[in-house]
UniProtKB/Swiss-Prot annotation:
Forms oligomers. Pfam families: MraZ. One of its GO terms (cellular component) is nucleoid. This is Transcriptional regulator MraZ. Negatively regulates its own expression and that of the subsequent genes in the proximal part of the division and cell wall (dcw) gene cluster. Acts by binding directly to DNA. May also regulate the expression of genes outside the dcw cluster. Residues 5-52, 81-124 form the SpoVT-AbrB domain. It is found in: Cytoplasm, Nucleoid. InterPro entries: MraZ, MraZ_C, MraZ_dom, MraZ_N, MraZ_sf, SpoVT-AbrB_dom, SpoVT-AbrB_sf. It comes from Shigella sonnei (strain Ss046). Keywords: Cytoplasm, DNA-binding, Repeat, Repressor, Transcription, Transcription regulation.
């Protein structure tokens, strides 16, 4: 399980160094193999360990290619999916087209989200967090049933 937000830097080749606390888990569970794709709702990337991505692929394969909305989701997620292998120094090379999609340049937020990571441009991440907090403060009881059961 991945949690927390960590500032990491992209090097001149577009590689990011995976924080040490995640490396062993990624090597053990995915042999360092990852899949990166776009987030279809936010300007960030989704980074999955390969076994987790394979579960997503199975779900995507069950969508109908005859339904335009389902086909669009397949096209966006699968069409942008790029495999990346963690090297001996714990770095992952993020494809240029993906970096461009998310506006990643130097400072990147690696955000743990249970079974995957989100990759955000640092400035965009902080803006999104502010928007989310503001929206939550303005919310007036529109909690889903699952959120109503969440006790912190």
């Amino acid at each position: 399980m991945f949690r927390g937000a960590t500032l990491v830097n992209l090097d001149s080749k577009g590689r990011l160094s995976v924080p040490t606390r995640y490396r062993e888990q990624l090597l053990e569970n995915a042999v360092g193999q990852m899949v990166c794709t776009i987030d279809i709702h936010h300007p960030c990337l989704l980074l999955y360990p390969l076994p987790e991505w394979e579960i997503i692929e199975q779900k995507l394969s069950r969508l109908s290619s005859m339904n335009p909305v389902e086909r669009r989701v397949q096209r966006l997620l699968l069409g942008h999916a790029s495999e990346c292998q963690m090297d001996g120094a714990g770095r992952l090379l993020i494809a240029p087209v993906l970096r461009q999609h998310a506006g990643l340049t130097k400072e990147v937020m690696l955000v743990g989200q249970f079974n995957k990571f989100e990759l955000w441009d640092e400035t965009t991440w902080h803006q999104q967090v502010k928007e989310d907090i503001d929206a939550e403060q303005l919310a007036t009881g529109d909690l889903s049933e699952r959120l109503q059961d969440l006790s912190l």
